[in-house]
Amino acid sequence: MATTIGLEGPEELEQLAFKKINEGKIKDGLKLILRAARGYEEERKKEDAARLYKYLGFVLLEKAGLIEKARPSLLKSAYLYIDLIEEEITRLEVDIDALDGYCSNVLEIFLTLKDERNLRKYAEEFAAIYEDLGKSYQDNDDIPMAIRAYESAYRYYKITDNIESYRRIAETLITLYGQAAEERLEKGDSRGAAEAFYRLASSIRAIFGYDIHFIEMMDTAGKNFEKASKVAYSNGDLDETTTCLVKAQYAYLLAKNYNRSKLIGINTVRMLYQIISSHRSRGDDEKAAEKLVELAEALIGVSKIEEAMQAYKSALETKSDLSFRVKIRLAILKQFAASKGDEDILEEVEKVEYYASKKNYMRALELAGNTLQKRPELEEIRNMLYEAEGIYQ
């Protein structure tokens, strides 16, 4: 192998690198990662090069614990991603999923490097890019894509504390969510309308705070989730029924409609025990695990934490999934935010939900974990959560 390595392309070098790393030969593996990254760069495969430079930087940071060791590789990755962003936004049809990934990687790197100046600079630039995209989609009456773009613009303006801009975007989102909700109601899509009302409530909170405007809209979301559950039940879809009911439970909880939330939660728990048993009897353990997580969410919503953690632990024994971990942390944070009327926690919940909606579960998990750690009132439930996950402090 040593005699032919110079003839190998970056793909082969990358495969060999990870083989070395998996064998415990970290130093040799990282040298090959660097060579593979340079090879991809020479072939103008910027995305692959950026990915490997980022990986190299994070491994060096983890092993050495020194930012300076990781800085060259991470900066190389960041600027390659910036090149990719510039290329993407000049295309006739922008791939917003690819753009999301590139922008997230750049900001993650500058956040890791504690480079506040570049973090704010590029967050501001990305916000403007997404705002322009949102306007373009809106002009073409593509409301779902306009919403996606404006949501990203809102998040990036929040990073820069540009109050005027993020309030402006929030106002635009209120209009678009309202339009989306109306369209879905006209089509008889209760769940789609409920999701739009839920997100509309979040934008209202950005302007008015945790007040009656937010509460009324969140209550409307709850009613539509409840209506969607009845439609699903009439169609014999019990899985969709309970999914909508758990969403209704938490919408009512955030709307401070505690009695309705509790009643739905208790009834949903009963249904879920039967559904889980049915999935298990058919040998569908994966679906049973998903419903066990839903059961845990419903139990957290009615403050039955010990039972919730037992259900969650059972789910993880069947299937360990990052999305499960995010869902449980969100349930804990929502329950706490509702019980305390804590707008700061709700702000963090919305950030976590944003990244979860992008399927960036690592970032969502990190944000949710940080929020849990900050609150001493959550120490007991946090310890129970870690125990269920097999993490001992």
Residue ranges of each PLM-predicted region?
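TPR-adjacent "capping" and linker segments in tetratricopeptide-repeat scaffold/adaptor proteins
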Residues: M1-E12, E23-G24, R117-F126, R167-L173, ...
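Structural motif corresponding to the intra-repeat A-B loop/turn of tetratricopeptide repeats
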Residues: E23, E43, K63-A64, L113, ...
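TPR-repeat structural position
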Residues: I26, K46, I67, I96, ...
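Alpha-helical segment of the N-proximal tetratricopeptide repeat
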Residues: I5-E42, G134-N140, M145, A181-E186, ...
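Hydrophobic/aromatic packing residues within the alpha-helices of TPR/SEL1-like helical repeat arrays
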Residues: I33, Y40, Y53, L74, ...
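Residue-level recognition of tetratricopeptide repeat
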Residues: F18, R38, R51, F58, ...
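Alpha-helical repeat scaffolds
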Residues: A70, F126, L133, I275, ...
